C-alpha cells in the first residue's frame, strides 16, 4: 500500500498487492515450482478465512437494529467471497477499491458516508485496530473498539487497552451488541 500511496505503483487492489508480496516471499525463500493455478489458489486464501468465534452471531445481533457494513482495504470480490465462506451477515460491502484509497486515508471514510448517504456523525467505525478507529474518528465517525486477542497470532500481544477517545469498548461482538441494546 505504501508503494501505491507514494506513487511508485498506480492504484492496485489488495488481491494484486497480496500476489506481489507472495511472489516476493517465494523468490526470497527459494520456493519455486508452483503452477500458476496453485499460486492463484494460495493467494486467494484470504477469500476463505474462517470467522472469529463471535463474529457471525455478534454481527447478526447488530444487524437486527443497524446496517452492518464492511469497510475494508480488501477488494469487493475478496470481501464477497469471504462473507460467503464465513457466513458473515454484512448488509453492504464498501471497499477501498471503490474509493481508490486505502484505510487510514480520510477519503475512504468520507466515501463510505457518501455511499450510505449518511452524515459523518451518524457513522460508527467498529474495529479491532486502533489506527483504523483513530483515522475514522478524525473524519467525524463515532468509534467502537472490539477486542481481539488473537488478531496478530497467538505469539503476539496486541494493544487492546481502552483509550479515552473511544466511544465504546467491547470484549467481543456480543458484548458490543449488549452495550447498544441489540
Give the residues covered by each predicted segment.
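Residue-level preference for long, well-ordered alpha-helices that form the structural scaffold
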Residues: 11-14, 51, 125
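Conserved donor sugar-nucleotide recognition element shared by glycan-biosynthetic enzymes
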Residues: 18, 51, 105
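Substrate-recognition element of Asp-dependent hydrolases with the DxDx(T/V) motif
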Residues: 34-85, 93-96
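Asp-based, Mg2+/Mn2+-dependent phosphohydrolase catalytic module
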Residues: 60, 74-182
Amino acid at each position: 500500500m505504501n508503494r501505491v500511496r507514494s506513487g511508485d505503483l498506480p492504484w492496485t487492489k489488495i488481491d494484486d498487492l497480496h500476489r506481489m508480496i507472495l511472489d516476493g516471499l517465494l523468490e526470497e525463500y527459494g520456493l519455486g515450482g508452483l503452477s500458476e493455478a496453485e499460486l492463484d489458489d494460495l493467494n486467494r486464501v484470504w477469500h476463505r478465512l474462517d470467522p472469529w468465534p463471535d463474529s457471525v452471531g455478534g454481527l447478526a445481533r447488530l444487524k437486527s437494529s443497524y446496517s452492518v457494513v464492511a469497510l475494508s482495504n480488501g477488494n469487493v470480490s475478496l470481501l464477497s467471497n469471504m462473507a460467503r465462506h464465513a457466513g458473515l451477515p454484512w448488509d453492504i460491502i464498501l471497499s477501498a477499491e471503490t474509493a481508490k484509497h486505502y484505510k487510514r486515508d480520510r477519503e475512504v471514510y468520507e466515501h463510505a458516508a457518501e455511499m450510505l448517504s449518511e452524515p459523518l456523525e451518524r457513522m460508527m467505525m467498529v474495529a479491532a485496530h486502533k489506527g483504523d478507529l483513530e483515522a475514522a474518528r478524525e473524519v467525524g465517525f463515532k468509534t467502537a473498539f472490539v477486542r481481539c486477542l488473537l488478531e496478530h497470532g497467538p505469539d503476539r500481544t496486541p494493544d487492546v487497552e481502552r483509550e479515552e477517545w473511544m466511544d465504546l469498548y467491547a470484549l467481543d461482538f456480543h458484548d458490543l451488541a449488549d452495550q447498544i441494546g441489540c
